[in-house]
Amino acid sequence: RSGMGNELNLVPVDKFTQQSKEYSNVFALGDANDIPASKAGSVAHFEIDVFVDNFLQYIAGKDMTHRFDGHANCFIETGEGKAMLIDFNYDTEPLPGRFPAAGIGPMSLLKPTRLNHLGKLAFKWIYWNVLIPGRPMPISTHMSLAGKRTDLISAK
């Protein structure tokens, strides 16, 4: 153990930049940090997109201007050949609606459907043939409210 972790052995970081709160030259991503977000693979993927831009600024001695918004999305198997899809971030809880994914088409949010189950199965191919080789994903790093039932967001 590095001794950088908190009582849960997670590195305390700025949730927007993943920069350590104690060591300015350390960044912790994914399962290693204490951000208030899911430990889903999508979170690590979106964090890394933001981190790369910030790290290039950091090593050039510039201010880090990119911010991770806590974006997470994942399929949840619900049984009987159906799955739900959720999409959320630090500020917005999962909302019902449609998830517009370029080239894939609309998928239902917070609703068990066969299409979502098939999307989850297709993601295995996307993982190995798009994500692992480092090809860009057709999903924005920052959460979009497009297609979501924003009328359900309560005023804070």
Model-based region annotation:
Residues G3-G5, G30, G41, G61, ...:
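Residue-identity detector for glycine
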Residues L29-F46, T78-F88, W128-H142:
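A broadly tuned preference for mixed-charge, low-complexity surface segments
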Residues L85-K156:
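C-terminal auxiliary extensions adjacent to catalytic cores
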Residues F16-Y23, Q57-K62, G105-L110, L118-G119:
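Short C-terminal domain-edge/linker segments immediately following a structured domain
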Residues D34, L56-G103:
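Active-site-proximal substrate-binding core of FAD-dependent oxidoreductases
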Residues R1-D49, L56-Q57:
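FAD-site-proximal beta/loop scaffold in flavoenzymes
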